[in-house]
Amino acid sequence: TRLPIALIKKHLLGIHNVSFFVPKTPLQRGLWALAHESSMFPSRGAQLLRDLTSQNVIEAHLVTSRFAFLEQNLYQFLNRWNLRQCFTSITLNKREEQPHKYKERVIRKMKFDYFLEDNWDIVAHLSSAVTDTEIHWIYNLLDRNRVYPTKHPYLEHALQDIIKKKHRSS
């Protein structure tokens, strides 16, 4: 659904800047929470993430643009799939900032070497706004033909690429 909405915003409404919907009413938040329940399974690569973090090969931080009202939902998901312990820190968008601006702020503050993101609009923003962090994009089926230097079909591929780069630089 993201592609048709983006086309309507750009070509019919003339909106060219990146902006995301922020649910405010109880109904909107309920529907938003329901939509995020669709993330029922972890990404392909979750086991590799568990292995790499438990062996201290990488230090992982979860930076999610999910809003504060989804915090319980997020922790239930992470606990259900034994992923919570993988992360040194978990940061939610508790101030309901625009997701791309929120992630830019957190990346600048934390000074990450690498950042993985699955939303093209956020990747496009971060890749020009944050130059000290290598932004990796985990693309979806609709966006697979976009050209981007560090794009991956799955979390697993992104992690493997980062590990190769870490070994080359050490």
Give the positions of each predicted feature:
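Short, acidic loop-to-helix structural element flanking the phosphoryl-transfer center
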Residues: 20-21, 29-61, 68-75
